[in-house]
Amino acid sequence: MKIIIPIKRVLDPYTQARVNKQTEQVDLTNAKMAMNPFCEIAVEEALTLKESGAATETIAVSIGTDKTVDTLRTALAMGVDRAIFIKTESELDLQPLHVGKILANIIKREEAELIIMGKQAVDNDNNQTGQILSGLLDYSLGTFISQFDLSSDASSVEVSREIDSGIETRKLNLPAIVTVDLRLNEPRYASLPNIMKARSKPLETIELDSLG
């Protein structure tokens, strides 16, 4: 089973945001950036599945400018097998539908059976990309997941999430998209040896225009 983990580069949550008075937008000039915290949880869950023998390969995918490569390197250092970088001129022009269409293209190409992603990015809090992907690909969908169990034959996953009345549990047949919540796991830190190894792991760059 091949797993794709879409990840996003965001302003470090522990950094004080600055606002550009002219544009009235967050000023990211020289700002400290990091992987979206929900994406870190998605990476951890994918790695756990790989280590259990349930997954054959884990692939991190991110869309953005050249600086996005640093975030992909972080995923590789955590243990992801390879990465795909979709290069754009600007990150600000991409809306969730655009992101969904780009990711759908890559998922089809890779023939991934399971997509694990953060429930939302902490910068815009859109909470739309997973749902859009499910519609575009006609994949099963589970959102806000706090518990995840793969079946013994790897044909389905049982997922749970918190709702107002308690815990909701559903079975999703693969292929499936799962968006994860903070309660699912505790992401690992990348060790120094793994940070060094990440430099030699495959990282493919694709120009956005080439996807059509």
Protein language model regions, located:
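N-terminal glycine-rich FAD/FM-binding segment characteristic of electron-transfer flavoproteins
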Residues: 1-212
